[in-house]
Design a protein with these regions (language model features):
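Conserved catalytic cores of very large enzyme subunits
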Residues: 1-496
Length: 496
């Protein structure tokens, strides 16, 4: 209307929008060291979404949708985290314009699949009208704005840790932290081994829920949010804050990660130990303890030393500073024999030769899907103090790096205390059950999106993945030379 009356021009409206984009980048969130590792980058999570549907199922794309994309192109700044909802009614040119933004290398927008997210939210009790009007809160988590208290980053759950507990019979650094599922070297079938993993997983999930629910109660008692509660239905009419369960929809959403490592680990164990019998479980366990052919790294030396010292203290011995130094020195000198080292190298090579997840191999991809169920299905039976349900997500942000640093070697050949694989969101996973969101980042060379033909192929890639019921995609478009030059001259690459 203002355009028709001459009150504002399209160009000046675009400039105002660009200014809002700049203003959003005035903010910064200073994180502690642990949070900075888990949420690496300029992650303020001010999410703005365009496209999608209204409550009646009509496409809501309009001129402002394109102007928002253009604003991100113009300012080349990380905020807002622009997202695009994609469904079978999305205008093709909206997707082309979004692809043009992706081509700039800014890492935006994120693409979300209505055909998966809406049914996933319906499965969590949202009405159809509310599910159709979902938006993204934070990183990749869908919810109905103004009606939800989702606590979408309630925890990060490393799926490799229960596997470590299977090999240690529930022990960690000399303490029983899991359940005792038996001596792994005496498990005669793969089914027995996999069942032990599932039991450790369920127990770890119960610990997570207990911790999260305790924190939830503490939030309600110690850090009430009266202003936010005024903005969320039905807090006022119920006379309850969001922390007390005043919102219409209440959830707790812990994120699981490490699916790729787990799929490869389970397949390798089944193949090498139980089917081909090329490696005994005793050898596998020993290889993991020694970190394959790498030997004990600094973190392993520290962990073993602490375990020995704790055992000495528990036994009534007086542990002095000199004692601690002597133990540390002794552990540092520990090395596998030449024969052990040769065998560990052979085992690691055999693991490398075993087929891996992500290569359209059904036997391996089955484990990825099943491990996801092992995490998500037990999770959804729990409830929080606000009367809401637990709902799982499958993504690590960047927590796979610090939490991988706390994880020993894994049976897929990953060395101790290195990052756990982040890739989890592929089409063969059941995204309908992961209503707290998934994350699937990919990297492309700029030449892949060159010209109109490159954009068309890129849009087809997204549509194909979404036709296979994937939930989310996001892309980095940059070449190696640019990244190397950015390390030398960061002032030239403020947009990266």
């Amino acid at each position: 209307a203002d355009l028709d009356k001459g009150i504002i021009t399209r160009e000046s409206a675009q400039e105002l929008l660009d200014c809002i984009w700049v203003k959003l980048n005035d903010l910064n969130k200073v994180r502690d060291a642990a949070s900075a590792e888990g949420f690496a980058g300029y992650s303020l999570f001010q999410n703005l979404i365009v496209g999608g549907q209204d409550k009646d199922g009509n496409d809501v794309t309009n001129d402002l949708s394109v102007m928002c994309i253009l604003a991100s192109m113009h300012v080349h700044l990380p905020m807002p985290s622009l997202s695009i909802r994609v469904w079978n009614g999305s205008p093709h040119e909206l997707l082309i314009k979004a692809a043009e933004l992706t081509r700039t290398g800014i890492g935006l927008p994120a693409y979300y699949n209505d055909e998966v997210i809406i049914p996933a939210l319906l499965n969590r009790g949202l009405t159809l009208a509310d599910a159709r009007e979902y938006n993204i809160i934070g990183c990749v988590e869908p919810q109905k704005a103004g009606k939800t208290d989702g606590w979408h980053d309630a925890a990060f759950f490393n799926m490799c840790r229960p596997l470590e507990l299977v090999f240690s019979n529930g022990m960690d650094k000399g303490e029983l932290v899991g359940i005792q599922t038996g001596d792994v070297t005496k498990m005669t079938t793969f089914e027995e081994f996999y069942d032990a993993y599932k039991k450790q997983m369920e127990y770890c999930i119960s610990l997570l829920v207990n911790a999260d629910n305790a924190i939830d109660v503490a939030h309600a008692e110690r850090v009430p949010l009266p202003f936010e509660s005024c903005m969320v239905d039905d807090c006022i009419s119920r006379g309850l804050s969001v922390q007390e369960g005043g919102a219409i929809y209440n959830f707790t959403g812990p994120q699981g990660f490490g699916i790729a490592n787990m799929a490869d680990s389970l397949y390798a164990i089944r193949k090498l130990v139980y089917e081909d019998k090329k490696v005994s479980m005793e050898e596998y366990k020993e290889a993991l303890a020694w970190n394959y052919d790498k030997g004990l790294d600094e973190q392993s030396v520290k962990d073993i030393s602490e375990m020995i010292l704790k055992g000495m203290q528990d036994g009534g011995m007086n542990v002095t500073e000199d004692t601690a130094k002597a133990v540390l020195t002794t552990v540092m000198r520990l090395k596998p024999t030449e024969e052990q080292l040769r065998r560990f190298t052979e085992i690691h090579h055999m693991i490398d030769e075993v087929p891996k997840y992500g290569n359209a191999i059904d036997d391996v991809d089955y484990f990825a899907r099943d491990v996801a169920y092992t995490y998500t299905r037990p999770m959804q039976k729990y409830h929080n103090p606000r009367g809401g349900q637990y709902q799982a997500g499958l993504y690590p942000v960047s927590a796979n790096v610090p939490l991988g640093g706390q994880t020993g070697a894994t049976p897929d050949g990953r060395y101790a205390h290195t990052p756990v694989a982040a890739a989890s969101s592929v089409a063969k996973l059941d995204h309908f059950i992961v209503s707290n969101g998934t994350l699937f980042n990919q990297k492309f060379h700029p030449s892949a999106l060159a010209g109109r033909e490159g954009l068309e192929k890129f849009v087809s890639l997204i549509q194909t993945f979404f036709d296979q019921k994937g939930m989310h995609m996001q892309f980095n478009v940059v070449d190696r030379e640019t990244l190397l030059d950015a390390q030398k001259h960061p002032e030239k690459y403020s947009h990266l």
